[in-house]
Design a protein with these regions (language model features):
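A short helix->loop->beta-strand "cap" motif at the edges of active sites that frequently abuts
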Residues: 40, 110, 187-189
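Proline-aspartate-enriched helix->loop->beta-strand connector
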Residues: 158-167, 172
Protein backbone atom coordinates (compact mmCIF):
# COMPACT_ATOMS: atom_id res chain seq x y z
CA UNK A 1 0.00 0.00 0.00
CA UNK A 2 1.71 3.14 -1.19
CA UNK A 3 1.36 6.62 0.20
CA UNK A 4 1.15 8.07 -3.30
CA UNK A 5 -1.86 10.35 -3.60
CA UNK A 6 -2.27 10.53 0.18
CA UNK A 7 0.82 12.37 1.32
CA UNK A 8 3.23 14.33 -0.82
CA UNK A 9 6.62 12.73 -0.26
CA UNK A 10 8.66 14.35 -3.07
CA UNK A 11 10.35 11.00 -3.57
CA UNK A 12 13.34 10.59 -5.86
CA UNK A 13 15.27 7.70 -7.36
CA UNK A 14 18.82 7.05 -6.13
CA UNK A 15 20.44 4.34 -8.25
CA UNK A 16 17.15 2.53 -8.67
CA UNK A 17 16.09 2.90 -5.03
CA UNK A 18 13.25 5.21 -4.02
CA UNK A 19 14.06 7.69 -1.26
CA UNK A 20 11.36 9.58 0.64
CA UNK A 21 13.05 12.79 1.92
CA UNK A 22 11.11 13.11 5.16
CA UNK A 23 12.29 14.69 8.40
CA UNK A 24 12.16 12.71 11.63
CA UNK A 25 8.99 14.53 12.73
CA UNK A 26 7.30 13.98 9.36
CA UNK A 27 8.17 10.29 9.50
CA UNK A 28 6.72 9.86 13.00
CA UNK A 29 3.54 11.74 12.05
CA UNK A 30 3.10 9.64 8.91
CA UNK A 31 3.70 6.38 10.76
CA UNK A 32 1.09 7.32 13.35
CA UNK A 33 -1.50 7.74 10.58
CA UNK A 34 -0.99 4.07 9.73
CA UNK A 35 -1.36 3.06 13.37
CA UNK A 36 -4.56 5.05 13.78
CA UNK A 37 -5.97 3.62 10.54
CA UNK A 38 -4.84 0.10 11.57
CA UNK A 39 -2.98 -0.37 8.31
CA UNK A 40 0.19 -2.43 7.87
CA UNK A 41 3.42 -0.59 7.11
CA UNK A 42 6.96 -1.60 6.26
CA UNK A 43 9.14 1.24 7.52
CA UNK A 44 12.43 1.03 5.64
CA UNK A 45 15.73 2.81 6.20
CA UNK A 46 18.43 2.65 3.54
CA UNK A 47 22.16 3.16 3.84
CA UNK A 48 25.04 2.61 1.41
CA UNK A 49 25.09 -1.12 2.13
CA UNK A 50 21.38 -1.51 1.38
CA UNK A 51 21.69 0.43 -1.88
CA UNK A 52 24.66 -1.76 -2.84
CA UNK A 53 22.55 -4.86 -2.15
CA UNK A 54 19.81 -3.50 -4.40
CA UNK A 55 22.23 -3.23 -7.32
CA UNK A 56 22.81 -6.99 -7.36
CA UNK A 57 19.66 -8.48 -5.82
CA UNK A 58 16.39 -7.72 -7.59
CA UNK A 59 14.28 -9.43 -4.92
CA UNK A 60 15.59 -7.23 -2.10
CA UNK A 61 15.32 -4.20 -4.38
CA UNK A 62 11.62 -4.94 -4.91
CA UNK A 63 11.00 -5.31 -1.17
CA UNK A 64 12.75 -2.00 -0.51
CA UNK A 65 10.92 -0.09 -3.23
CA UNK A 66 7.56 -1.59 -2.26
CA UNK A 67 7.94 -0.30 1.32
CA UNK A 68 5.47 2.39 2.26
CA UNK A 69 8.15 4.70 3.69
CA UNK A 70 11.85 4.68 2.75
CA UNK A 71 14.05 6.92 4.88
CA UNK A 72 17.63 8.02 4.23
CA UNK A 73 19.15 6.21 7.20
CA UNK A 74 22.86 6.37 6.39
CA UNK A 75 24.85 9.62 6.27
CA UNK A 76 26.41 8.40 3.03
CA UNK A 77 22.98 8.27 1.39
CA UNK A 78 22.18 11.83 2.50
CA UNK A 79 25.52 13.16 1.25
CA UNK A 80 25.30 11.24 -2.04
CA UNK A 81 21.76 12.44 -2.70
CA UNK A 82 22.71 16.07 -2.09
CA UNK A 83 25.80 15.69 -4.30
CA UNK A 84 23.52 14.44 -7.08
CA UNK A 85 21.21 17.43 -6.67
CA UNK A 86 18.39 16.02 -4.54
CA UNK A 87 16.97 17.78 -1.51
CA UNK A 88 17.21 15.71 1.68
CA UNK A 89 16.36 17.62 4.88
CA UNK A 90 18.17 15.32 7.29
CA UNK A 91 19.34 11.85 8.08
CA UNK A 92 16.70 9.73 9.80
CA UNK A 93 18.83 7.18 11.65
CA UNK A 94 17.00 3.95 12.37
CA UNK A 95 17.97 3.77 16.04
CA UNK A 96 16.84 7.37 16.61
CA UNK A 97 13.56 6.77 14.78
CA UNK A 98 12.94 3.64 16.85
CA UNK A 99 13.36 5.66 20.04
CA UNK A 100 11.01 8.38 18.76
CA UNK A 101 8.38 5.73 18.03
CA UNK A 102 8.87 4.22 21.49
CA UNK A 103 8.28 7.66 23.01
CA UNK A 104 5.12 7.94 20.89
CA UNK A 105 3.92 4.49 21.96
CA UNK A 106 4.69 5.27 25.60
CA UNK A 107 2.67 8.50 25.46
CA UNK A 108 -0.25 7.27 23.35
CA UNK A 109 -0.62 3.71 24.66
CA UNK A 110 0.32 1.95 21.42
CA UNK A 111 1.46 -1.66 21.82
CA UNK A 112 4.88 -2.99 20.80
CA UNK A 113 6.55 -6.32 20.08
CA UNK A 114 10.33 -6.86 20.02
CA UNK A 115 11.79 -9.59 17.82
CA UNK A 116 15.53 -10.16 17.52
CA UNK A 117 18.98 -10.33 19.14
CA UNK A 118 20.17 -12.76 21.82
CA UNK A 119 17.90 -13.52 24.77
CA UNK A 120 20.29 -11.78 27.18
CA UNK A 121 20.38 -8.65 25.01
CA UNK A 122 16.61 -8.61 24.68
CA UNK A 123 16.04 -8.99 28.42
CA UNK A 124 18.57 -6.26 29.28
CA UNK A 125 16.93 -3.91 26.77
CA UNK A 126 13.48 -4.58 28.21
CA UNK A 127 14.78 -3.87 31.73
CA UNK A 128 16.09 -0.49 30.57
CA UNK A 129 12.85 0.26 28.73
CA UNK A 130 10.82 -0.30 31.91
CA UNK A 131 12.63 2.73 33.36
CA UNK A 132 12.82 4.84 30.20
CA UNK A 133 9.28 4.12 28.97
CA UNK A 134 7.27 3.26 32.12
CA UNK A 135 3.90 3.19 30.33
CA UNK A 136 5.09 1.18 27.31
CA UNK A 137 2.76 -1.70 26.44
CA UNK A 138 5.05 -4.58 25.50
CA UNK A 139 2.71 -7.33 24.32
CA UNK A 140 5.41 -9.76 23.25
CA UNK A 141 9.07 -10.41 22.58
CA UNK A 142 11.15 -13.13 20.99
CA UNK A 143 14.90 -13.58 20.42
CA UNK A 144 16.29 -13.61 16.90
CA UNK A 145 17.56 -17.18 16.83
CA UNK A 146 15.12 -19.55 15.17
CA UNK A 147 14.84 -22.21 12.49
CA UNK A 148 12.82 -21.95 9.29
CA UNK A 149 10.31 -24.33 10.88
CA UNK A 150 9.69 -21.85 13.70
CA UNK A 151 8.86 -18.90 11.43
CA UNK A 152 5.16 -19.72 11.22
CA UNK A 153 4.84 -19.95 15.02
CA UNK A 154 6.54 -16.55 15.37
CA UNK A 155 4.24 -15.10 12.73
CA UNK A 156 1.15 -16.44 14.51
CA UNK A 157 2.35 -15.16 17.88
CA UNK A 158 2.66 -11.66 16.43
CA UNK A 159 -0.71 -11.98 14.69
CA UNK A 160 -2.42 -13.14 17.89
CA UNK A 161 -0.93 -10.33 20.01
CA UNK A 162 -1.69 -7.79 17.26
CA UNK A 163 0.89 -5.14 18.23
CA UNK A 164 0.82 -1.67 16.74
CA UNK A 165 4.61 -1.80 16.27
CA UNK A 166 6.96 -4.70 15.61
CA UNK A 167 10.67 -3.89 15.89
CA UNK A 168 12.79 -6.52 14.15
CA UNK A 169 16.41 -6.67 15.28
CA UNK A 170 17.91 -9.29 12.99
CA UNK A 171 20.42 -9.03 10.15
CA UNK A 172 19.81 -7.87 6.61
CA UNK A 173 18.54 -9.14 4.21
CA UNK A 174 16.92 -11.81 6.39
CA UNK A 175 14.80 -9.24 8.23
CA UNK A 176 13.48 -7.71 5.00
CA UNK A 177 12.39 -11.07 3.61
CA UNK A 178 10.79 -12.09 6.90
CA UNK A 179 8.92 -8.80 7.36
CA UNK A 180 7.62 -9.02 3.81
CA UNK A 181 6.51 -12.62 4.38
CA UNK A 182 4.61 -11.72 7.55
CA UNK A 183 2.94 -8.76 5.84
CA UNK A 184 2.03 -10.85 2.79
CA UNK A 185 0.41 -13.32 5.19
CA UNK A 186 -1.81 -10.60 6.63
CA UNK A 187 -0.04 -9.56 9.83
CA UNK A 188 -1.40 -6.06 10.36
CA UNK A 189 1.31 -4.05 12.17
CA UNK A 190 3.89 -1.35 11.58
CA UNK A 191 7.10 -3.30 10.97
CA UNK A 192 10.50 -1.68 11.34
CA UNK A 193 13.78 -3.50 10.78
CA UNK A 194 16.31 -2.08 13.24
CA UNK A 195 19.39 -4.26 12.68
CA UNK A 196 21.73 -4.12 15.67
CA UNK A 197 19.83 -1.42 17.55
CA UNK A 198 18.84 -3.84 20.32
CA UNK A 199 22.54 -4.38 21.11
CA UNK A 200 23.07 -0.63 21.47
CA UNK A 201 19.88 0.12 23.40
CA UNK A 202 20.60 -2.75 25.82
CA UNK A 203 24.04 -1.31 26.56
CA UNK A 204 25.89 -4.29 25.11
CA UNK A 205 27.46 -2.18 22.35
CA UNK A 206 28.34 1.51 22.60
CA UNK A 207 27.07 4.02 20.09
CA UNK A 208 29.37 6.63 18.57
CA UNK A 209 29.59 9.93 20.50
CA UNK A 210 27.40 12.76 19.22
CA UNK A 211 30.28 14.64 17.61
CA UNK A 212 31.04 11.60 15.42
CA UNK A 213 27.36 11.23 14.52
CA UNK A 214 27.18 14.91 13.53
CA UNK A 215 30.43 14.60 11.54
CA UNK A 216 29.00 11.62 9.59
CA UNK A 217 31.63 9.34 11.16
CA UNK A 218 29.41 6.93 13.07
CA UNK A 219 30.38 4.18 10.61
CA UNK A 220 34.07 4.61 11.55
CA UNK A 221 33.28 4.19 15.24
CA UNK A 222 31.38 1.00 14.47
CA UNK A 223 34.24 -0.42 12.41
CA UNK A 224 36.72 0.38 15.19
CA UNK A 225 34.55 -1.53 17.66
CA UNK A 226 33.68 -4.48 15.40
CA UNK A 227 36.48 -4.62 12.77
CA UNK A 228 36.09 -8.28 11.85
CA UNK A 229 32.40 -8.05 11.15
CA UNK A 230 32.21 -4.57 9.63
CA UNK A 231 35.52 -3.80 7.86
CA UNK A 232 34.48 -5.27 4.51
CA UNK A 233 30.97 -3.84 4.69
CA UNK A 234 32.13 -0.28 5.31
CA UNK A 235 35.51 0.08 3.63
CA UNK A 236 34.90 -2.10 0.58
CA UNK A 237 31.17 -1.36 0.51
CA UNK A 238 31.60 2.40 0.86
CA UNK A 239 34.23 2.46 -1.88
CA UNK A 240 31.82 0.61 -4.17
CA UNK A 241 29.03 3.02 -3.25
CA UNK A 242 31.20 6.10 -3.90
CA UNK A 243 32.17 4.74 -7.33
CA UNK A 244 28.50 4.24 -8.18
CA UNK A 245 27.66 7.77 -7.04
CA UNK A 246 30.45 9.21 -9.21
CA UNK A 247 29.20 7.14 -12.16
CA UNK A 248 25.70 8.57 -11.61
CA UNK A 249 27.12 12.09 -11.57
CA UNK A 250 28.94 11.51 -14.86
CA UNK A 251 25.76 10.14 -16.44
CA UNK A 252 23.80 13.21 -15.36
CA UNK A 253 26.28 15.52 -17.09
CA UNK A 254 25.94 13.82 -20.47
Amino acid sequence: MSLRGEIKLNSFDLMGVRIDPLTMDETVQTVEKFVLDQRPLHLMGVNADKINQCQTDESIKKIVNDSEIINADGASVVLAARYLGYSVPERVAGIDLMQELLHLANEKGYSVYFFGAKEEVLNDMLTIFKKDYPSLRVVGHRNGYFSAEEEEAIQEDIREKNPDFVFVGITSPKKEYLIQKFMDNGVNSVFMGVGGSFDVLSGHIKRAPLWMQHAHLEWLFRVANEPRRLFKRYFVGNATFIKRVLDEKRKSKK
